[in-house]
Amino acid sequence: MKRTVTKSIAIIGEGETEWFYFDSLRVACRYPFKVAPDFPQHSDINHILKLVESYLNKQYDFIVCLFDMDRLYQYPSEMQLYQRAKKEYNKKKYAGKVMFVETNPCTEFWFLLHFLPNVVCRRYESYEQLLPELQKYMPGYEKTKRYFIRTNLYKYLTENGDLERVMSNSEKLCQLCQKSPEDLKAYSEIHKVIKLLNEIKK
């Protein structure tokens, strides 16, 4: 009988939003990954890169790092460090082990894409600018631990929104943004993580 080899995956998020979303996805879909750090907190780029090295040393098969680009655009020194690290982990020796996943401005844009019927190029400078739009579809949404504990994010988004739509819209937006990155349009690469998880689960 063929033994199934479980791949080890660490998903590293900057804050509570990412932690609660991916933890709710992990439970709903029974994915065998770890969401890190263990206790959600706002982490700077240095802390995230230390976690990457820690999981590489532990021989994890895949390490996914989630980044809100609005924060990096605010702090040029962090952006420089981010770009250097991204270039380094793109090298052959890491063989696709480390994945940097961007959302501009923040993870909430990925949530919003579950509800938008068409691919629309928008520009949001910040979470605050995006929030009123998201609250049309997620009334009462707030970036607080209390809200996240009360609301199963993955379940709410897939039951009230459309997962196929968000995957498709997200991919198309990333393609459009590659053509004109200077426009700083809103986009999310989280579809890459969902694809990876689906492939590993097969």
PLM region descriptions:
Residues 14-18:
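Short glycine-enriched loops at secondary-structure junctions
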Residues 13, 67:
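Short beta-strand/turn micro-motifs composed of small residues
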Residues 31, 41-46:
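Eukaryotic endosomal/vacuolar membrane-trafficking regulators centered on PX-domain-mediated PI3P pathways
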Residues 1-6, 19-37, 50-58, 62, ...:
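C-terminal accessory helical subdomains adjacent to catalytic cores in phosphodiester-
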Residues 8-12:
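Conserved beta-strand elements of the Class I
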